[in-house]
């Protein structure tokens, strides 16, 4: 099975095109204004319009107002929504696009129970828990906390980079991996060399 790759926190058209050229299946745009990787829906639209076919454009939100989600869907031309806060299942499924639900993993959290609440999601994204930081922390979590029988496709995130993505895939067996800080030169500025190295790491995992 080919592991899908999403490069998140895109703010520049050249970074999006580099990611896609190097093999990424999806690019993520952070519509949370407190993030250093924030981009406006209009700016995201300018990037989305340059992408080739069959590349998924993902809008990332943290406890947004419904109107903001609707506006960004309309303006940016998204394909998929990613909710990274404490949004309820009812909130997530009210929109015109499919969604994935992110959860920050820590000991004691029942991931099977959590996943059972979001049966309408197309995937469950597992990220690292850091107090006050919804994502993009650059820190990995203990992959041993991931149950083998998650009922939703697993998207692995949290501190992934070229040096650990092969072992992460071997251990967690995800449907997809999501990377942001691990391929950056600075927050919101991607490094094509790091993206290329990350993609090689994904490729190695598929050959083992």
Swiss-Prot record:
Its EC number is 5.3.1.24. It catalyses: N-(5-phospho-beta-D-ribosyl)anthranilate = 1-(2-carboxyphenylamino)-1-deoxy-D-ribulose 5-phosphate. One of its GO terms (biological process) is L-tryptophan biosynthetic process. The keyword Amino-acid biosynthesis applies. Pfam families: PRAI. InterPro entries: Aldolase_TIM, PRAI_dom, RibuloseP-bd_barrel, TrpF_fam. Pathway: Amino-acid biosynthesis; L-tryptophan biosynthesis; L-tryptophan from chorismate: step 3/5. One of its GO terms (molecular function) is phosphoribosylanthranilate isomerase activity. Keywords: Amino-acid biosynthesis, Aromatic amino acid biosynthesis, Isomerase, Tryptophan biosynthesis. Belongs to the TrpF family. This is N-(5'-phosphoribosyl)anthranilate isomerase. It comes from Nitrosospira multiformis (strain ATCC 25196 / NCIMB 11849 / C 71).
């Amino acid at each position: 099975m080919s592991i899908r790759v999403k490069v998140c926190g895109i703010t520049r058209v050249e970074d999006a095109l580099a990611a896609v050229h190097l093999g990424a299946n999806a690019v993520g745009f952070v519509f949370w204004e407190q993030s250093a990787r924030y981009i406006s829906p209009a700016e995201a639209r300018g990037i989305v319009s340059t992408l080739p076919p069959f590349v998924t454009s993902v809008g990332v939100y943290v406890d947004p107002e419904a109107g903001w989600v609707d506006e960004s869907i309309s303006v940016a031309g998204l394909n998929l929504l990613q909710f990274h806060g404490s949004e309820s299942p009812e909130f997530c499924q009210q929109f015109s696009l499919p969604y994935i639900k992110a959860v920050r993993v820590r000991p004691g959290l029942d991931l099977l129970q959590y996943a059972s609440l979001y049966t309408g999601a197309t995937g469950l994204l597992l990220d690292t828990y850091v107090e006050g930081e919804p994502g993009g922390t650059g820190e990995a979590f203990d992959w041993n906390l991931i149950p083998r029988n998650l009922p939703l496709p697993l998207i692995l995130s949290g501190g992934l980079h070229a040096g650990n993505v092969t072992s992460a895939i071997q251990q967690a067996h995800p449907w997809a991996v999501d990377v942001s800080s691990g391929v950056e030169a600075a927050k919101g500025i991607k490094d094509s060399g790091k993206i290329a190295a990350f993609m090689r790491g994904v490729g190695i995992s598929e050959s083992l």
